[in-house]
Design a protein with these regions (language model features):
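Short alpha-helical segments that sit at the start of domains
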Residues: 1-11
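Short capping segments at the starts of secondary-structure elements
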Residues: 16-22
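Residues that mark the N-terminal boundary/hinge immediately upstream of a DNA-recognition element
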Residues: 22-23, 62
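A short acidic, leucine-rich amphipathic alpha-helix
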Residues: 25-29
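Short amphipathic alpha-helical interaction segments
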Residues: 31-46
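A short, conserved structural fragment
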Residues: 45-54
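Basic, amphipathic "hinge/linker" alpha-helix immediately C-terminal to the N-terminal HTH DNA-binding motif
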Residues: 57-72
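Amphipathic alpha-helical dimerization/coiled-coil segments
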Residues: 74-88
Length: 88
């Protein structure tokens, strides 16, 4: 896997946390080091894209985070379609 953009990393984290999961699972699913993950988690929580649930000690993607994921996926599909159209 090559270098990923910050938006791709954010999307990986939000996708992994959709429905709620632990920090360790997010780290493995998003292919991030512990330090990288902590940096991103702070940013995502500050911006209300992710929430920490004390009772279960899990992270969960918020409604705002789900909207971000939806837009990111739509843009990705649009770019993929544009690339395919240009190659034909």
């Amino acid at each position: 896997m090559g270098n990923r953009s910050r938006t791709e990393i954010v999307s990986s984290i939000l996708d992994a946390a959709n429905g709620g999961t632990t920090k360790t699972k997010i780290m493995y699913i998003a292919f991030l080091s512990y330090n990288q993950l902590n940096e991103y988690l702070s940013i995502l929580i500050e911006n209300n894209l992710l929430e920490y649930l004390d009772g279960t000690k899990t992270f969960k993607t918020t409604e705002k985070g789900l909207n971000y994921l939806k837009m990111h996926n739509e843009i990705g599909e649009l770019l993929q379609q544009t690339t395919m159209d240009n190659n034909n």
